[in-house]
Amino acid sequence: MQKIEPINEKEAGWIKAQLNNASKFVEGFSPSDSGHPLTLAALDRAFAAWVASGPSETDLVNAIVNYVGIAFGQALADGLGLKWVIATDDRGSDLAVLGFPEQGDILVYPANFVAKRWERRETNFLEEAYRQITNDVGAIARRRQIS
């Protein structure tokens, strides 16, 4: 059975650090976006440039996946009102963003979402995924209003 818990102060601090690192990542791999607020478009450009650079060092790959994933999760939290949580199941615990708890449960694991795209070397997916998730959240919200 899945267990959902709010994040603690340490986890909130780690998220903040990842967002700071995501901004630095964009500065390094998409210089034209440097000095501007972090956007999914900028993250898409930086991630595509980084993937094209052929990274192979495991610790660096994991770090970048976390930077980009956490920034994606924060965009979902900021834009759609989802909340950061720790989701635990029989496979372990991970950071996720949650919407409509107990009423439809939208649960997105943003770092895992990015990791799967990294495995396929897929790029330019963040903005489109955000649009799709926005549509899904809107559909659930409309269904909740009807019932």
Predicted features, each with a name:
Residues 15, 22-26, 43, 47, ...:
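Generic structural signal of hydrophobic/aromatic residues within well-ordered alpha-helices
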Residues 1-62:
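N-terminal low-complexity, intrinsically disordered segments
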Residues 98-147:
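A recognition module on extended beta-rich or small alphabeta surfaces enriched in W/G with H and D/E
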Residues 62-117:
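Amphipathic protein-protein interaction modules
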Residues 22, 29-33, 50-57, 75-78, ...:
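Short secondary-structure junctions and interdomain/linker hinges
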